[in-house]
Curated annotation (Swiss-Prot):
Name of this protein: Uncharacterized protein YybC
Species of provenance: Bacillus subtilis (strain 168)
Length: 159
């Protein structure tokens, strides 16, 4: 796990990259936009990654950490800390990045007769359905494993 700001930045970039890639492909599939893959799609993914990283580092990450460590659980158990942090991060990132998804959808197709609020809630629901298990079961363990095996030893050796 990250022990300082530099490690936190590297870990955040790795996690955001993985989550944004998978979530972007998922959203393209459920919105039937996967067939229209273009340079614009890549541009939207890059913008989405930059927004997600900024949210992770500046807003959602610090807030999730605060909330997670205020919860009443045994903080000496690493699995509880990971579950609390992951849950808070997914909720925060889904709520924020769904605004990005809503803006993108409105600019591309309009609201199709839905209210802004109901369209947002639907996007949140669809994103949470994939993001939470993806984070807990695949991306979280994968990024933590890669980080601990390849990144952390190099950073520790450099000090």
């Amino acid at each position: 796990m990250p022990a300082n700001k530099k490690e936190g930045l590297i870990f955040g970039v790795m996690m955001c990259f993985g989550m944004v890639c998978v979530m972007s492909i998922y959203n393209a599939i459920i919105n039937r936009a996967i067939y229209d893959f273009s340079l614009m799609t890549v541009f939207e993914m890059v913008i989405g990654f930059m927004i997600a990283l900024l949210l992770d580092l500046l807003l959602v990450g610090p807030l999730a950490k605060k909330i997670a460590f205020r919860m009443p659980f045994d903080k000496t158990k690493k699995i509880y800390v990971i579950l609390a942090m992951s849950t808070c991060m997914v909720i925060g990132m889904v709520l924020c990045m769904s605004v990005f998804g809503l803006v993108t959808a409105v600019l591309a197709n309009g609201l199709n007769g839905d209210s802004l609020f109901s369209a947002y809630l639907m996007i949140v629901l669809k994103n949470f359905i994939l993001a939470y298990p993806l984070q807990l079961l695949i991306m979280g363990p994968l990024v933590r494993g890669v980080f601990m095996k390849f990144v952390k030893p190099k950073l520790t050796a450099a000090i």
